[in-house]
Amino acid sequence: MTLRHLELKDCQSLAKEFLRPHHANYLAMYSSVLGGVVTHPFLMTVPVDDHMVHRGDGIFEAFKCVNGNIYNLQAHLKRLEHSARAVYLSLPANPEQITNLVVGTIRISGTRDCLIRLFVSRGPGGFTTNPYECPSSQIYIVVCSPSSAPEEQRREGVSIKSSSIPIKRSYFANIKSCNYLPNVLMKKEAVDAGVQYTISMDENGFLGEGSTENIGLVTSEGVLKFPRFSRILRGTTVTRAVDLAESLVKAEKLRQVTFEDITLNEAYCGSEILLFGTTFDILPAVMFDGHSIGSGSPGEIYHLLRQLLEEDINSNSALHTPVFDSE
């Protein structure tokens, strides 16, 4: 096999050959390495010697813009700062500057509805594990077309199973790092098993989290339970759902909302199981390890919480960061 020796002058023709159907979802990317925004997917690159690439040494957040408003951005930036402190990574910009970069990138993308992925890397500098060989951290912001769960899953529910992949230790569980190998294996496990999601278990048999999802249980007594955050990521969507669920307690649709250990058997016997995530907001799980949950159909609390979340996302101006000047 003869290898092509490619040079800079070849890039224009390579860009035409490069495009694939999925690239249509990549709308814009800001790179602090390039110092600007690109909209051609061929240019959406990260240096191979960036420690985020070869060591997973970076952190990230994913959030969405709905009708020209970024939802709950401050919660994501707060968690980004927590992750940065935990891995001793200096953010190359303050929250206000990061917000301006995100807003500017969305504007250039030309869309009002999108999913944004914000990465902060250790930066380029070499191929060892030594973080000090990187002169400075870098920021990459990718704006993509919005994605969500199929309407069928919202209407009929999803199937989940317990995972065989070891749960993360507490220190790493609450760092949203770019080292997501356990999460990748959990998703592979779900696809291979023919279910939508798998749920991690700790050493004592208590529920953890999905590959990118938090889980909640509505008991037959009307208690909405969530696993403790000690071994799982403090999800922004589930945190918001907890706040909103208090109105259901006041309306006597729920008895209370708690964080506690949840066994598999308790989950099997629950009346509803709920999944929470940035892309789909909330989904009902109607089958767990082959056990039908509750009536086998999405329940009342799912429908009520879904409505509350949708109203919060669309109408809660206190959690909106406007992208366009007219707003």
Indicate where each model-derived feature is located.
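Helix-start/capping segments and mature chain N-termini
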Residues: 1-93, 100-104, 126-327
